[in-house]
Amino acid sequence: MSELPGRILTKRLPPVSRLAFGSLTVGPLQADLTPERAGEVLSYAFDRGINFLDTAQYYRNYAHIRAGLQKCRRPEDVMISSKTYAYDRAGALEAVDEARLALDRDVIDLFMLHEQESIHTLRGHREALDTLFALREKGVIRAVGISTHHTAAVEGVLQLAEEGVVLDVVHPLFNKAGIGIADGTPADMAAVLTRLHDTGCGIFGMKALAGGHLFQNAGEALAYVLEQPFMDAVAVGMQDEAEIDANIAFFTTGAFPANTRSLEKIRRRLHIEEYCEGCGRCVRRCQQGALVLTESKEETENPYDFGAAFAASEGIVSAGEPVSRTVAAVDPDKCVLCGYCTAVCPVFALKVY
């Protein structure tokens, strides 16, 4: 069996497997596996050689990861990257302490600011960033970085470096089609990532398959990302052992095995349940502009079988009369299946499966 290839992501960490486990998929925002089942999946991945995992405070899946670490043979070999939306010192300290306690780890390998957009958001989160640097110096975390969907944020990291504020790692959205890149093309993102990587900053990508949009040409899409000289590792979401086997095969041999189930057969999408209340929180949360509020016409039920005239006189809508209500709708061509909208829905009407 071929060994899973590794790379130096940053001098502050041992080599990481180029295939990183994107753990969003196993938690409550996507597949919603139980911690027990997720632990089985994760430990299988770790025992097969994946030694790098991406998570976030927002994902609410630390219990799942802890179960995987407890089940695997060598938990000490697994490096964990987490992220936080914290913007001040108190929030950053709380986020790191939460991860350490929930994961039962004294040290978190990589901690990042989540979803940065530009130099302006980096400056707005500077207190949290400085706190992460201080924790790195104390040995509580080993490396510091950001995640982003924006070329402008990568430019911002370069600008900070010129000012003497040097990040260890950047975790950008990058795929062949450019789906999900908020402010440019794949060529734009590749150009700025090349400049950043040349400074010594580590880069591990996300959304290589664009949240499932590129499943039908998964091999071509993954190869494109892995062939980029600046790409040290790639986080790929996986939900079961079969997906782990398929991706490990590709990362080690450059091809999916013939007996692997077709990836297009497991294509996922965002589902919006009928009981959506149309509050608009998901629309405001979506950075891709994939969600909108729309009017839905529905026929009403009249359990009392009132006549139309009587119903009208009493202000009651007659049975079968269409009424309009506001609900959320998704544009599947824009949705990257990040699942972040599901976390803000008060009635859990959004699900990725």
What are the residue ranges of the model-derived segments?
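N-terminal binding-site loop/beta-alpha segment at the start of enzyme catalytic domains
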Residues: 1-76, 137
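Conserved, mostly hydrophobic/aromatic
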Residues: 9, 21, 45, 53, ...
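Acidic (Asp/Glu)-rich catalytic clusters
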Residues: 10-16, 47, 66-77, 97-106, ...
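Active-site mouth loops of central-metabolism enzymes
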Residues: 24-36, 81-91, 117-119, 214-216
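Short, acidic/polar
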Residues: 31-45, 89-104, 150-160, 216-224
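Iron-sulfur cluster-binding cysteine motifs and their immediate structural context
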Residues: 57, 281-299, 307-322, 340-353
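Active-site groove signature of glycoside hydrolases
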Residues: 100-120
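Beta/alpha (TIM)-barrel catalytic core signal, keyed to glycine-rich beta->alpha loops juxtaposed to Asp/Glu
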Residues: 116-277, 281, 289, 322
